[in-house]
Amino acid sequence: MIKPLSEQYVSFLHDESRLTGEAADISFPQTVGEVKTVVAQCLALKVPITVQGARTGICGGAVPRRGHLMNLSEMNKPLNVLKGNDGAFYLTVQPGYLLSSLRRDLRTRRFEWLDPALVDPAALAAFSQAPEQFWPPDPSELTASIGGIASTNSRGPGAFKYGSADNFIAALQVVTNDAEEHEIKDDRDLLEAFIGGEGMLGVITALTLRLQSKPSEMWGIGFFFNDENKAAGFMDQAVAAGLPALAALDFLDAVSLTLAGELKQVAAKLREIPETPPEARAAVYIELHGDSEGEIEIAAQELMEAAETFGSDPDTSWALSGDETEKLRLFRHAVPEAVNTRLDQIRLDYPGAVKMGGDLTWPGISFAESLAHYRRDIEKSELTAVIFGHARDNHLHVNLLPRNEAERQRAADLMAAWLDHSRELNGRLFREHGVGKIKSELFLNHEQPREIQSWRELKDRLDPDGLWNPGNMFQEVVE
């Protein structure tokens, strides 16, 4: 069950962050029993365990520092469908179950792998006859595992309307330091500690997801602007409109559009997407969700008129509905993919290059003010940067791409200043990507002291020997 970390497994030593680690051995458990066996063997010998899902993280949280690497990709099935007293449906899944599989199975309602010992036939029958369900967090990275999404409390494009994953996770099964499985359901504080805990407290072996009826109307709209400041003004007006149907409101700067366009030339999945207007300096991506076509049409018309007042040409806008909106999501998701491709190119000349990506919020000020602040700092620093992200709480992902050691230091200083500004505004310093190993120093130097202390106390209580995912959040000290 536990295998030496030989050459055939070296790809498991890194994730999308491009950080590479090391481990002595690896396992691919398929059952809870196998997880418990591996955990018992490792902890008895004080061997650290790094828990890993689909390796789509960008902060190195699933990259091992040493010890044992437990990959959960073989625990990839749905287990049970329930109907709650609230009338909602709940789906219990294994942690390695991919978001793409969840979306497919909810669409087709074919759950061949459900455990017959668990399933209530009446609940399954009701589910098969109910309107199509969906899981609202729905991050844009379809190859992410549900366990991984939970471990960073990730959000999708629809976070403007639905919030984070923890709003739609009702219960967890976890194996902890006693090598036994425990259910966490009623203790919401403990549940939310594991959701977003980055594998530092134990291994998630099952998750119960709260589903919701899929809106019958789902529209995707893209507006293009020749001036990013006008795009920012439109973002603020769209937020102020308070439209109930507004599910996603994202910003992409000129570099984002250029990089996504370059990726479009070589990625088959993007070829059906129209070309962006050559003069565009920014874009705003919108999703509208609702059950009334009339409501969606009114919201779309209001947004289109507002965009036009800020200089967006309606003839260049994109508008798709239903399953076609996935094309726009693919374009939006192409931006971080393209950033990683550009980082790989930089590494040819600067092997130590690491992307410094912001994942913080600046609440209480306008989106336009936030964007202007970032842009002013970037221009002063003369760094290469890509800006994209969400309107809610001005949650922008500012990616800095240093090309040499001097730029790396300037990027680190700039990121530190932005984190401090977020703290001054009572924002979130690490919102949806986690801290992992890449941002642990930033976490310790800039997070609110009470937040650091809370995590430290929890870690000491549930993992006193520091054997679960060492190096995440807290810098590991090896004696």
Task: Describe the function of each predicted region.
Residues 4-12, 224, 232-413, 417, ...:
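C-terminal substrate-recognition/cap domain of FAD-linked oxidoreductases
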